[in-house]
Amino acid sequence: MQAEYNIVRPYVYSHSMPITNYGHSNQSMGHPWGGNFQELLAIARYHKGRLYADAKITVGTKGLDYNTTANDYNYGGNIYKDYDEKRPYDSGVTVGQGNKTNIFIADLQAGYLINPMTNMKLFGSFIYRNFDPNQNTTTVFNESTTWFSFGVRSDVFNWYFDY
């Protein structure tokens, strides 16, 4: 069992010159969600003999920009925006400000180890994601996705040795 809680205040990882923010190739290097969020992760793993199961659950909230003509403020979630421009306020800044969005991700996987030498596994997987903002806009809207997958995987060249 593992549990992890992360909280990042608005405007963290951003800069007044967006080219000097804490990002690379349009990705945040500090955290995949950028700034202005809080999340709780829980991971459980089980194996008995050659059977195994993994469960990963993520629950969080993130404050996004509205990006509308009536409200084009920078609420601190996008690290590629200048944190000095279009701030709605300088004091009373809270995590989740802006278009507060609830996020839920569940990833469940189970399988059977066919060959331990090559780590060949037969597996099945279920992934569910729910993205639920307080207000739907053209760029941010309520969406749920579900994936089922199954297959065979292997580490053909498993050259990790402990001496």
Question: PLM features: what roles do these ranges have?
Answer:
Residues 1-163:
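Exposed, low-structure sequence patches enriched in small/polar residues
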